[in-house]
Amino acid sequence: MSDKTLSAWNTVKTDRFLVGVPHYPEHVDESYWERDAERMAKAGFNVVRMAEFAWHILEPKLGTYDFDLFDRAISILGRHGIDTIMCTPTATPPRWLTAAHPEILRVDGKGRPMSHGSRQHCDTASPVFREHSKRITWAMAEHYRDNPFVVGWQTDNELNTSMPESFSQATLSEFQAFLADKYREISKLNAAWGGDFWATAYDSFEQVVLPIEFGPTFPSPGHLQDYHRFLAFSTARFQHDQVEILRDVKPSWFVFHNLGGLRDIDFRGQFSKDLDFVGYDIYPMLYDEFMRLGNHAKVQALHLDICRGFSGNYIVPEQQSGFGSQPGFCTLTPEPGELRRMALSSVAHGADGLMFFRWRPAHFGAEIYWMGIIDHDDIGRHRYEEATRFATEMTALKDKILGTYVRMDVGIAGSDFDNQEAHKTYPIGLPSPQDDAILLHQYCYDRGIACGFIHPEDDLSKLKLFYVPHWVMWKDEWTARLEAFAASGGTVVIGARTGTRTQDNHVIRETAPGTALSRLTGVRVEDFGRLAAPGANGLFDVMERSGGLVIPPNKPAESHRRQRRFKIGNREMTAGHFYENLTIDPDVEVIAAWSNRYAEGQPMATSRKVGKGQVVYLGTYLTPELTEALTERLFAPAGVEPLVGGLPEGVEVTMRMNDERRLLFVQNYMDQAVTVDGVPAGRDLLDGEKMVVGRLELEGYGCAIVEVEG
């Protein structure tokens, strides 16, 4: 494993701002290639990405390699000044491989093997598949080692996006080996998984089964946690096989992966440390359809800020350019001006390179209506013009943009694999830590406050406030880091339930939130309970159990009536999701108290001075109303202020900076013109360095990058 330091403040180290497209020369007649290269060069593109789904072309039968198609395509592009990023094609193994080795196919939770085709149909835990993956990677690396136009590599494609889990025999065998290596003795595994509950103990590692849910009832949370740890380990190992080969063949190549669904990947482990930087594929209008936040600009900012928390700045290997679809879903079509605005938003949130998906749409297959820069009729319209404008701007501004990090005044604890998985193993209808954090992120986004995600092991010194959203798994060394941050003047906010489970996913045996956190916060949890979500009829909408899902009647339960209310400042509001009854130390200030039922007058939220700062504890989950009240109380004393005050609706503001410069990105994500007041003095780098003093006029989907004076 690399000793690379992972930090949200890292920048991408490349010799240019990479700008271009994923390109599929195998999808179009060769008579188009020269014209394609000419138009890419005219657009200002300097790189393409190729071959991630082309294993069947590169190796049409076992041991017989044919690189001719890609050699010719790379050569034509190179003559026009366009370099190539090659991809290991292991997301789509060829049919001859699965026909010869059907045991490498993934198996779902019902025991059904995946059919050949589509993508990610093979099991990355399979030793047989791993050997073939290494073989094709080595063959490609050796072939392209001396090609001057091949500058870097992408591993696989969106690992674990289609189907992260597998219940194959290969996965079972590898899982058993993983556990034997971790625990050494079966008695230690039984203790970690709570084998004395429901007769789940094992006599040997060979007896261990995969955690198929509802077989007939729920598996142990410890069992589930280790299974997903194994999946993350297996994914990182599969990628490491490839990275090791690429590094050995040509150390000067950069290597990255294009993240998609973010499932079963430990971003603070070997997976990210093996890479020069991460890539993240961003389809704002698609992700908004999944999340239904009602605003694709907010969704884009959220996803990119989460990604940046893994290891810092990134590149975008696939940026939505047009209408996107597969047979079962589709997206909105970006209006004229939106392609460039979305691309600039990616840069504003940390992209140090960007490729528009894709050069031209396919005329066949399961993505025929996933549009690209060029249309089906081979004509480049407004998307080509906008991509050209963006490429020209990034080439001109690369020395300003590269080397800057994204400012973050409010940090949200993120990028911790164990905590997201621990929630999934025992959710009891509660929002995940990330879902809870979305409320704070959206609040900051709407008000132009610099906000992002960062791990407590990272450098917190640039922050002013740090929020921990209900991380049930906690390490005492993190407590020491939070204490040091507060002592130096920072504000720490810790959500309910934090620190209540061990690394084995057991409930702790001390009074919550655990000895170290209790000392830091001055708080002890005496009792707790679930509450209905705001507006809900009960504690859950769907009950999962053996035999399927049970949907309760659409009528109020007792939990709908049994509300917990609290007062904070001069406001009174209803708590959502969860409550805790707290006792406190003498040096702790109560900043919110329960105001009804038996807990009336008892602390709900507290603050304890630590050095120059404070540590706040919340005995509930965030709601929109609580988020507003809490930030009004905490932000100003912490020194948290908007980058631009009084933002009109539809305007996004972010800042990239370093010791030499500050770049304020101001974007209008609405289709109507808007006036933004309160902009700090500087020069708009997208408008001929025009001087900006206080006021900025933006057309619909208009953007500015203001290099702030002083």
Where are these regions (language model features)?
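Carbohydrate-binding surfaces of carbohydrate-active enzymes
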Residues: 205-208, 252, 272, 283-286, ...
